[in-house]
Amino acid sequence: LRFFLADKPDAIVVEFFSGSGTTAHAVFRLNRQDDGRRSSISVTNNEVAANEQKALRESGLRPGDAEWEQWGICEYVTKPRIRAAVTGRTPEGQSIKGEYKFTDEFPMADGFEENVEFFTLTYESPLRVSSNREFAKVAPLLWIRAGSRGRRIDDISRGWEVTDTYGVLADLNLTQDFLNAVRADEAILLAYIVTDEDRL
């Protein structure tokens, strides 16, 4: 990755079929080497290996069951690996032994100064989202689109909210209050309007 991203400290790396999370791990390491702020988005389908699927089906389990999903590559390999890379600790809480080698040697137990979020994508009813009953489920996507920096807006029950780099307006009757808050903060780069109002 260094060959392609060395001169792109703010790059966004998207990997589909991310497997064990090697690309995200490499982005963390590259950021540490050059103080970059690259983001990595890893997408996987949490596939369970064919031989394990057979045994799980024979025991009465099906895709979607928690006991099935725990053996998928994302749940069993990717998430634990990424958490361990960032924290420097195993899933059992022990410091990781060993050091990273070559370009920059340092203990794996040091971890990385990275923010990590895991999301399970689902299909949501537009009516429930537009009426704010499911806003928390789309909130992470808005935060990612706004740059994945700072606090995430998870609740807009008061009609609007502003955070470090973006704002969300849900009640058009409160537009002026929202605009005043946005104007008062030069760091805000993006505003979302979440509504089903016909007057727009």
Predicted regions and their residues:
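Conserved class I S-adenosyl-L-methionine
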Residues: 10-19
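Glycine-rich SAM-binding Motif I of class I
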Residues: 21-25
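Accessory, often C-terminal, charged low-complexity segments
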Residues: 1-11, 31-200
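Hydrophobic residues on the short alpha-helix immediately C-terminal to a glycine-rich phosphate/catalytic loop
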Residues: 26-30
